[in-house]
Amino acid sequence: MTQVAKNDHRLMQVLLAPVVSEKATLVAEKNEQVVFEVARDANKGEVKAAVELLFKVEVESVQILNQKGKQKRFGRFMGRRDHVKKAYVSLKPGQEINFEAEAK
């Protein structure tokens, strides 16, 4: 497991949701990575520890992406969607996360 000593309560709050999109499925098939939306203050060590704790898999590496919110018009006012932080998690060979089986 990971050398990062974090309490389990914090790790349960790091992963917000898996990202299910066309790009995420292509990345999952091609590079054997899983994409998660994570907390804005999470770092790579916390994401790695959280994935290993929740899904009982071994993580090879984590890449973090900060996606800025788009500018949108709301009536006559300009607004902005929320910023999103995503984590691309590479699993070690032979490891996989199946969200369909986990949900049952």
Swiss-Prot record:
What domain of life is recorded for the organism?
Bacteria
Which GO molecular-function terms appear in the entry?
rRNA binding; structural constituent of ribosome
Spell out the InterPro entries in the cross-references.
Nucleotide-bd_a/b_plait_sf, Ribosomal_uL23-like, Ribosomal_uL23/eL15/eS24_sf
Record's keyword annotation contains Repressor: no
SUPFAM superfamilies, per database record:
Ribosomal proteins S24e, L23 and L15e
GO cellular component terms attached to this protein's record: ribonucleoprotein complex; ribosome
Pfam families membership: Ribosomal_L23
One GO BP annotation of this record = translation
Does this entry carry the keyword Amino-acid biosynthesis? no
Keyword terms, alphabetized: Ribonucleoprotein, Ribosomal protein, RNA-binding, rRNA-binding
Family that this chain belongs to: Belongs to the universal ribosomal protein uL23 family.
Function of the molecule? One of the early assembly proteins it binds 23S rRNA. One of the proteins that surrounds the polypeptide exit tunnel on the outside of the ribosome. Forms the main docking site for trigger factor binding to the ribosome.
Its subunit composition reads: Part of the 50S ribosomal subunit. Contacts protein L29, and trigger factor when it is bound to the ribosome.
Descriptive protein name: Large ribosomal subunit protein uL23
